[in-house]
């Protein structure tokens, strides 16, 4: 695992990172709604097959949970951005700050592209279903990590309790 990461990081940091061979253009266009892990992965493979791919995402930067939910210590944003830049070099177009249904209609997307792939993520924290879970200062782990990633100010008070023991809870503790 460490060897794979070393080789991958070294390639991404080189002047000429590996870009897979791109098949001849198919003449088909694909819109991918959502620029998180699934959207980025799909765009990579669709572009490799010769399709004209556009990612449409509501956030200011692509990456979804990779950017806004996983802390820097687990996934350096510089590495993520280099991966996204590589996908752009493959010819994938990236349209950010665009909310489907608000800034751009789904109907317009369907009319413009031959295919549409929806890869919108699951950004919801599982709420505590108990008394007091709705008082000010109580927030879900995913919401907390997203606010930190966006450099939003959070008033944590003098003491904090993290409920849970999974990855999100541990990331919240370490953050």
Indicate residue ranges for each PLM-predicted region.
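Ferredoxin-type iron-sulfur electron-transfer modules in oxidoreductases and energy-metabolism complexes
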Residues: 1-24, 148-149
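Solvent-exposed alpha-helices and their adjacent loops that cap or buttress functional pockets
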Residues: 22-25, 110-111, 131-132, 152-155
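Glycine-rich beta-alpha-beta "Rossmann" dinucleotide-binding loop(s) and their flanking helix/strand
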Residues: 116-118, 122-145
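Glycine-rich FAD pyrophosphate-binding loop
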Residues: 51-67
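A short, charged/proline- and glycine-enriched loop
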Residues: 23-30, 138, 156-157
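Conserved beta-strand segments of alpha/beta enzyme cores
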Residues: 52, 91-93, 137
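N-terminal Rossmann-like dinucleotide/flavin-binding domain of flavoprotein oxidoreductases
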Residues: 3, 66-114
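Rossmann-like dinucleotide/flavin-binding elements
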Residues: 31-56, 95-106, 110, 124-126, ...
């Amino acid at each position: 695992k460490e060897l794979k990461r070393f080789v991958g990081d070294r390639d991404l940091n080189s002047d000429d990172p590996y870009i897979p061979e791109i098949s001849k253009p198919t003449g088909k266009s694909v819109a991918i709604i959502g620029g998180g892990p699934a959207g980025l992965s799909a765009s990579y493979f669709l572009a490799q097959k010769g399709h004209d791919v556009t990612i449409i995402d509501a956030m200011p930067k692509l990456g979804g949970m990779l950017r806004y939910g996983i802390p820097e210590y687990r996934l350096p944003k510089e590495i993520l951005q280099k991966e996204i830049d590589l996908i752009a070099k493959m010819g994938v177009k990236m349209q950010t700050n665009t909310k489907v249904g608000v800034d751009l209609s789904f109907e317009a997307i369907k009319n413009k592209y031959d295919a549409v792939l929806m890869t919108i993520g699951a950004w919801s924290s599982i709420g505590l279903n108990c008394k007091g879970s709705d008082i000010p200062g109580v927030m879900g782990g995913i919401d907390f990590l997203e606010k930190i990633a966006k450099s939003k100010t959070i008033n944590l008070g003098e003491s904090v309790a993290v409920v849970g023991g999974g990855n999100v809870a541990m990331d919240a503790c370490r953050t």
